Amino acid sequence: VSAFSDLVGNLSLGLSVALSLKNVGLCFLGCLIGTLVGVLPGVGPIATITMLLPITFGLDPIGALIMLAGIYYGAQYGGSTTAILVNIPGEATSVVTTLDGHQMAKQGRAGVALGIAAMGSFFAGCVATIVIAALAAPLTAMALLFGPADYFALMVLGLMFAVVLARGSVPKAIGVILVGILLSTVGTDLESGEERLTFGWTEISDGLDVAVIAMGMFGFAEILRNLETTQTRDVVHGAIGNLLPNRSDLKQAAAPVARGTLIGSVLGLLPGNGAVLGPFASYTVEKKLAKDPSRFGRGAIEGVAGPESANNAGAQTAFIPLLTLGIPPNAVMALMVGAMTIHGIVPGPQIMTKQPQLFWGMIASMWIGNLMLLIINLPLIGLWVRLLKVPYRLMFPSIVLLCCIGIYSVNNSPVEVVMTAGFGLFGYALAKFGFEPAPLLLGFVLGRLMEEKLRQALVISRGSFMTFVDRPLSAGLLVLSLILVVVAILPSIRQSREQVFKEAD
């Protein structure tokens, strides 16, 4: 009973913070921008958050994080609009929605598909917020018991999950992560004062900025990939129709929404591609449970309801490892670490104990944000359709300009703009050779944290690496990491893993 009353008390504290006029305004702005970048193919939340990081300098930490979080889950909502109306997923997580969502639109049921996607996302978002609130206290209490060796082992496990869930071969994913960790060591060593991998270049003596790598790998590289492929935009020209599903539609969609919410909530916790796999896993489950699986791919409402719910639930539960353990499970959460660092906040269990207003304010803002997204998305569908008719070749110059302004304004450094372009070419080359860029950013952000924890553990143990084996928790986590990689390399698992990603594509 006391745990429940604590939860209610904490959520009421969060609502009192999130419902201030300023924070409601920032939440609305984040959700609106997020929906916009979700609707426009090729402008993801990663590039957008990177672009807006400098603006957060002038905001208070709570408002800044509420806005950035709104952009992330708003983009998941917006991606479904493009998937249904144009057959192009605005977000990687909306790929599965194109299969049945666009078929429904072609049958004159675009409104119902959009309505059920929005309602499913709203329900999943609300449930995921309750899950975050419920798991926050026990996970934070557990995290406070972790020593440096345990934290190091937990981050190794996180990176191994990212390896297993990354597209492409396991060795490629490990290679990309190692490059990310190597890049995290660039700059001056804070312990010895020695410069590492700077090659005498003073501009990088403070280390590489996470914004430079993120904007290059996910902003510029994405633009290059989009220019290369000529997308045929199969825009639905007919009337969208009634946005409110009828009773029969709601009855058909109810169970898939509940199952999708559960699947997405669990997979969203996993580092790497967990949130992306949620919608695909939901679609597979719905197809297996269906009385007539042949309906899928021809406009089955369950094929929209389940994946869209999983998509939004996963986007929100991804905040759990970040807020409780200080470990980002995906590239967007890695940028949230950057945003927190700007404001002098150390991600992890201390947020909840030392800054409860920020922690609970951010969680409560997700409820408000989900309600806003329902209000923003349905009435503005006409506007999004008009936007989608603008050819990409006319949009990309302004996107490039905004990316350059965003990077320049982080440190007022022209050199960083050039470096971003370099990382853009590097990211484009990686994609060409079948490497996935997201693990690199994860390796870069976790690399710094891992080095810090490794050093702390060795100082405590007086230089003995046995500390990682002596402690049962760190030993268990390292063994689990090893098992994960070995299992992923096994031929039978490797084939089914490749099959999953092939179908997801």
Briefly describe each language-model feature range:
Residues I62-I66, Q103-G120, K291-G303, A331-A334, ...:
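Membrane-interface alpha-helices at helix entry/exit sites of multi-pass transporters
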Residues P45-P54, L68, A83-Q103, A134, ...:
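Re-entrant/interfacial helical elements at transmembrane boundaries that shape
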Residues V37-I46, I84-V95, V127-V131, L267-V276, ...:
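Short helix-coil transition sites and intra-membrane helix breaks within transmembrane domains
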